């Protein structure tokens, strides 16, 4: 790959952030970009290395990347991340953390460049096939995709690992080998170490053929997107929720295609056919008085008021009581924060009143703007607060008296003509 070819592959970007693990693939990519920059000095390249903390060698890898980038005069950002168990598996969780770090580091006018190659594409296709994916999943990885308001570019997607090895040998490049790449308990490693060598030995152009199939699937998916764009817009509310009633009159195939695209708009991992059926049967068609939910990664598909909602999963806070010792400063909560701000109708606490944030209230409540008393459940219903927000919305208490619900109501015991408001940042 000549400098002109790599320049064309990232055109029109001349400011690049390169995902740099220190392995063979990203080392070759960074080297080629460095050679291009030597010919065109206005090109700006930064590298980012993500330290996952999964290997005892991780600190050595950082030192290697720092040394190489220093010798090539390329600024290196090292991001240390901690993986949270969200039920995705180690591989998927590491990838998620990595791309969150990329997104955080990417600057305006800069494109993200990563080093996936043809063999990676083949593995991705086979993993999607193993999951029973449709055209969207079998499209595997595009050369370019939208990312964090810019683009993610994969210039090496048409090259084999063998060609990258030859480049590295020709230029005497040094790289690191992650020992976990030899662990065939991981699906991708199993394919790379055991399956693909056999397939390539039997059919030398298997990876190329797989890439063509992935491209054809991507074309079909793109065509479907074009054909369904207007219809999808007609069944999505202005707030991004999916209306159930018009979907009921559609064929299962058409309905599933629209649900998939609604989920894709929320950057959800594409569900299996079984999961799509469950979204429709268990969530959309659940009885009216039910509060159905289906967990997808760190999010949930919920139904409320005849619509499907895509919401971030939040554990219940119902039994928590959090003391607010100094209401003049922001109080950090397990999920967000609260503070007092000017311009509301909440009275400030008296010096002898203990201030707490809670998430449930018992008995009959009297709120401003409503005649008579009612229970909290009834108040939530009147204000159209979705069920999943009812036990996570902060309730302000002075002593044992409910004063206000953040952003929703003030009780008669807490109201004053010129007071403050309770701001909640979730």
Swiss-Prot record:
Coarsely, its chief localization is cytoplasm
Q: State a single Pfam family of this protein.
A: TilS_C
Kindly give the Gene3D superfamilies that the UniProt entry links to this protein. 1.20.59.20, HUPs (3.40.50.620)
Concerning InterPro entries, the annotation shows: Lysidine-tRNA-synth_C (IPR012796), Rossmann-like_a/b/a_fold (IPR014729), TilS/TtcA_N (IPR011063), tRNA_Ile_lys_synt (IPR012094), tRNA_Ile_lys_synt_N (IPR012795), tRNA_Ile_lys_synt_subst-bd (IPR015262)
Q: Which reaction does it catalyse?
A: cytidine(34) in tRNA(Ile2) + L-lysine + ATP = lysidine(34) in tRNA(Ile2) + AMP + diphosphate + H(+)
Keyword list, A-Z:
ATP-binding, Cytoplasm, Ligase, Nucleotide-binding, tRNA processing
Domain of life assignment = Bacteria
Q: What class of enzyme is it?
A: ligase
CDD domains, from UniProt? TilS_N
Keyword tRNA processing listed? The answer is: yes
User: Its Gene Ontology molecular function terms?
Assistant: ATP binding; tRNA(Ile)-lysidine synthase activity
Q: What is its EC number?
A: 6.3.4.19
Q: Does the keyword Membrane apply?
A: no
Which cell locations does it reside in?
Answer: Cytoplasm
UniProt-annotated binding residues for ATP: 21-26
In the record, biological process GO terms are: tRNA modification
Q: Which GO terms describe its cellular component?
A: cytoplasm
Q: What does this protein do?
A: Ligates lysine onto the cytidine present at position 34 of the AUA codon-specific tRNA(Ile) that contains the anticodon CAU, in an ATP-dependent manner. Cytidine is converted to lysidine, thus changing the amino acid specificity of the tRNA from methionine to isoleucine.
**Which comment does the entry carry about domains?**
The N-terminal region contains the highly conserved SGGXDS motif, predicted to be a P-loop motif involved in ATP binding.
Per the record, the similarity remark reads: Belongs to the tRNA(Ile)-lysidine synthase family.
Quote the PANTHER family the UniProt record gives: TRNA(ILE)-LYSIDINE SYNTHASE-RELATED
Which HAMAP family does the record cross-reference, listed alphabetically?
A: tRNA_Ile_lys_synt (MF_01161)
Which named protein is this? tRNA(Ile)-lysidine synthase
- Its source organism is Enterobacter sp. (strain 638)
């Amino acid at each position: 790959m000549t400098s002109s070819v790599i320049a064309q592959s990232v055109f029109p970007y001349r400011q690049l952030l390169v995902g740099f693990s220190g392995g063979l693939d990203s080392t070759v990519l960074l080297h080629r970009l460095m050679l291009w920059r030597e010919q065109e000095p206005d090109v700006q390249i930064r590298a980012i290395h993500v330290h996952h903390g999964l290997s005892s060698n991780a600190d050595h890898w950082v030192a290697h990347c720092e040394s190489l980038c220093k010798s090539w005069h390329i600024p290196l950002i090292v991001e240390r991340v901690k993986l949270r168990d969200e039920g995705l598996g180690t591989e998927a969780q590491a990838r998620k953390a990595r791309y969150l770090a990329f997104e955080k580091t990417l600057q305006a006018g800069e494109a993200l460049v990563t080093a996936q190659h043809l063999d990676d594409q083949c593995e991705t296709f086979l993993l999607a096939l193993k999951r029973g994916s449709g055209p969207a999943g079998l499209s595997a990885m595009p050369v370019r995709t939208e990312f964090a308001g810019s683009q993610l570019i994969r210039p090496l997607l048409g090259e084999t690992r063998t060609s990258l090895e030859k480049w590295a040998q020709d230029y005497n490049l040094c790289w690191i080998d992650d020992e976990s790449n030899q662990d065939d308990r991981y699906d991708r490693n199993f394919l790379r170490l055991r399956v693909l060598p056999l397939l390539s030995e039997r059919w030398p152009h298997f990876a190329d053929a797989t890439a063509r199939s992935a491209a054809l699937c991507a074309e079909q998916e793109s065509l479907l997107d074009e054909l369904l764009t207007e219809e999808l817009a007609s069944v999505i509310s202005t707030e991004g929720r999916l209306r159930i009633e018009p979907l009921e009159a559609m064929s299962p195939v058409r309905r599933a295609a629209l649900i998939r695209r609604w989920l894709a708009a929320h950057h959800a991992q594409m569900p299996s056919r079984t999961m799509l059926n469950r979204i429709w049967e268990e969530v959309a068609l659940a009885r009216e008085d039910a509060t159905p939910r289906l967990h997808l990664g760190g999010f949930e598909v919920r139904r409320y008021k005849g619509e499907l909602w895509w919401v971030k999963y939040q554990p219940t806070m119902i039994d928590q009581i959090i003391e607010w010792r100094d209401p003049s400063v922001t109080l950090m909560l397990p999920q967000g924060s609260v503070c007092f701000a000017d311009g509301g109708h909440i009275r400030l606490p008296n010096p002898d009143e203990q201030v707490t944030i809670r998430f449930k209230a018992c008995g009959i409540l009297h709120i401003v703007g409503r005649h008579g008393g009612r229970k909290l459940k009834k108040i939530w219903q009147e204000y159209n607060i979705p069920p999943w927000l009812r036990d996570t919305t902060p309730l302000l208490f002075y002593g044992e008296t409910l004063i206000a619900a953040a952003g929703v109501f003030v009780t008669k015991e807490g109201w004053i003509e010129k007071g403050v408001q309770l701001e909640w940042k979730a």
